[in-house]
A protein has these predicted regions:
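Short beta-strand/loop segments at the ligand-binding rim of alpha/beta enzyme cores
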Residues: 2-11
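Short, surface-exposed basic-aromatic patches at helix termini and helix-loop junctions that form
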Residues: 1-3, 24-25
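Auxiliary Fe-S-binding modules of radical SAM enzymes
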Residues: 15, 19-101
Length: 101
C-alpha cells in the first residue's frame, strides 16, 4: 500500500533457505540473491540460491545471483572466494532469469 515505484527483493546476505512464495507477485520487479562477504562471512549454500531461483521462475519474476559471498557451499564442499571474484563467479554460474515485461 506504500507508493513505491520499483519493488525489488534483495536476499543478502543469504544465510538460510527462504520461502518467498507469499511475496512474489506482479508488483515485484526482481529478486536478487547474494552471499556474505568479509573475514567472518557465514556460509551461503548454493542449493538455497537455486531454490529461490525456482520460486522466481514459478512466479515469472526475474532473478539475479549477484554475489557468491566469501564462503559458498556447493556439492557438499565449501569454497572460499576472494572478494574480487565474488560477483564474476556468481555471473559465471549462468542462473540469472530474465523475462520481457
Amino acid at each position: 500500500s506504500l507508493p513505491i515505484r520499483h519493488k525489488l527483493l534483495f536476499c543478502a546476505p543469504l544465510l538460510g533457505a527462504l520461502d518467498l512464495s507469499g511475496y512474489l507477485d506482479d508488483d515485484i520487479e526482481e529478486v536478487s540473491v547474494g552471499g556474505e562477504s568479509g573475514m567472518d562471512a557465514r556460509v551461503c549454500d548454493y542449493d538455497w540460491v537455486l531454490d529461490i531461483r525456482r520460486q522466481c521462475i514459478a512466479a515469472d519474476i526475474p532473478f539475479s545471483f549477484h554475489q557468491t559471498g566469501a564462503r559458498l557451499r556447493k556439492g557438499g564442499r565449501v569454497y572460499r572466494i576472494r572478494r574480487e571474484f565474488q560477483h564474476s563467479q556468481a555471473r559465471r554460474a549462468g542462473i540469472n532469469y530474465k523475462i520481457d515485461r
